C-alpha cells in the first residue's frame, strides 16, 4: 500500500486542500510559508498517535475559517491505495478501513479534532452569537474565546473507513505504521553520540552477532549456529565477570560501607558490591567516533552536514529493525514512512544530489522504507528528483495556496515532458520556487534584464526601481532556447482542464526573428526591411506565432513579448534601433582591427546619422568604403538593394542600416557583448539623467510581471 492522497480541512494554512502522492519518493517544494511542513505534520497527525492532541494548539486551526456558528474542527483524511505485488500484511492492516475497489482497494484513515456533542457544544452555540457584528464574526475575539473556555475540551480521534460511520481505527493496526519525521531543527549530535541514546542503543543491540544470525529468529537458526551464539554469550559473561572482580578488588569498600554500620543501616542487611554485566549494559559505553587517516575524532567535532547524514543512516537502520518480525514479532511495523525536512541542511550541492538519489534508490530497491516525503528549498534536490515525484506548493494569481504536479502538467505531450526532465537543472528548477517567472531566450538577455529594469522606477517616492522590485516580488529570470519555450510553458498552462499545471504569472521575452522562405523551401532569418507582402515572408517567426496562439491566448497567466512586428528583430537589434546615435551600445567586443566592424568605423557611421538622421545613403556609402573582401561586398549589395526598395521613411532606413550592421557585429559574440554592455549601462545609470532608451517591449514585459 501507499499514501495516495490526503485531504486537509481547517488545519493551519489549509482551509480545504487535497494533495496526491506517488508510491515511492515525494519531493515537496515551495516558497517559505507555503505549507510544506504543515503538509507533513498533517500526515503525522493521522499516522502517529503520539503527536495527536498533545501537540495541537488553537493556532493550528486555519485562520481563514469564518463560519463560527458551530465549533471549528480539524479534519485530515488520507487514502491508502493498493500497490502491485504488495506484501500480504498490508491488506490485513487496512482491511477494516477499505472503502472500495477501483479496481484495487482503497482504504481511508481520518483524523478529527473536535468539540464533542453535549453540554459544552450547546453552550458554545449559544454564546458564539454574541461575537457577531453585522452578520460577520469577530475572528480574533472568537479564537480567544475558544482558547479560554473550550479548547481544553476538544478531543482527537482517528477513524477508519467511511468517515460517516465514525468507526474508530483499531489502535493495534495503527501501530503497524512507522512514521519517522526528521525536522529541520534536528540535533543529530545529541541523538547519536553515546550508546545510551535510544536510537543508537537499539541499532547496536539489533546488529549484535548479526554476522551469525543474519537477523533471523532464534527458532529458525540451525543447531550449530545456536551453539556458536551460546558460546559467544557465555564467553562474554565469563570475561565480564573477571573484569568486574578485578575492578572490585581495587575498591576499598570497607571505607565506604563503614558509614552504613555507624548509621545503623547495616541492621537491615550488610551492603556489598555486586554486578552482572551483559551485552546490553556495555552498549551504554560505546560512542560514535570518526576516523580520518588513522586519527580518531569525537562526533561533536564532525561537520554538521555529515552528522545529519549519519543520523539519517541510524534512523533508516532503526526502521529496518522495527519492521523485522524476527526481532519484534507481532509488534513489527508493516509500513515504514520517512519524512525529512530540508535534507539539504549543511550539505554542499553534490552531496544533496547524492543524498536524494540514495534515499530514492532505497525505496526502489525495496528497502525497508516504503514511502518517502522530502520538503526542500533546494534547486539541487529538486533537479535530482524525478519530475513525477515533485509536488509544488505555490500562491496562485488570486493569492490562494495551490498545488501543482509538474510531472502531470504535460498531459499527452511526452516530448515536452522528456525535454523538461532532461534540462530542468538546478538553475532552471528555480522557476518552480519563484512567485513569478520571466523566460528569456539567451544568457545575454538573462544577464542584461536586471540592468534594463533599473532604468525604470517602480516606486519613485521610495526610490525603488524595477530591478529592486524583481527581487522584492521573488521574480526569477530563466534562460531557455527560443524554440523550446513551449516545453517549459507546459508547466504553467493552468486552466480548469489542467489543474496539475502551476498557475504562476509567466512572461516570455523573445525575439521577433522575421524570416523569409528561400527557393529551396527553407525558412531563414532576415531583416525587417527585407520583408515583403508575400507568403514567403513572416514578420514574426512561426515559433513566436505558435507561442502567442498556443499559450498567450488560452492562458491568462502567460504573456509573450517581442520586438515590434515589421521593424524589430532581436534584443541587440532593438538596442541600436532605440539608441542609433549613442556610443553606449559600442563595447570592447567589437573587432579591434582589420575589419569594417571596428569601434572607429562604427562611430563614423553614427556620426553620419547624428549629422543628418535621414541620410541613409551617406551611411551606406561610409560603410561600403570599409569593405575589403568580395564576400563582404556581395552581402552588402543585397542589403543596399533591399533598403532602397523598402517603404520605410528615410530616418527609419538610416536606423535600419545601422541596426543591421550592429547586429552582424555582435551576433556571434552575444554573451561577451552583453557582459561589456551591462558594464557600460551600469555607468550610465550612475548619471543624473541616463541617456540609454529601453526597448518598448522590454518595458511592457516588466510592467506586466510586476503589476
Model-derived features: where do they sit?
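Switch/communication elements of ASCE P-loop NTPase nucleotide-binding domains
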Residues: 1-48, 281-427, 663-707
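Activity-critical C-terminal alpha-helical subdomain
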Residues: 505-656
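Extended helical coiled-coil dimerization/tether regions that scaffold
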Residues: 176, 188-340, 517
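Switch/connector loops and helix/strand junctions flanking conserved nucleotide-binding motifs
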Residues: 85-90, 119-124, 189-193, 381-385, ...
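RecA-like P-loop NTPase motor core
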Residues: 364-366, 382-510
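Nucleic acid-processing catalytic cores of prokaryotic defense/repair systems
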Residues: 1-106, 113-116
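Flexible phosphate/Mg2+-sensing switch loops adjacent to catalytic phosphate-binding sites
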Residues: 48-72, 320-333, 365-369, 373, ...
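Glycine-rich phosphate-binding loops of NTPases
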Residues: 53-68, 84-220, 412, 524-553
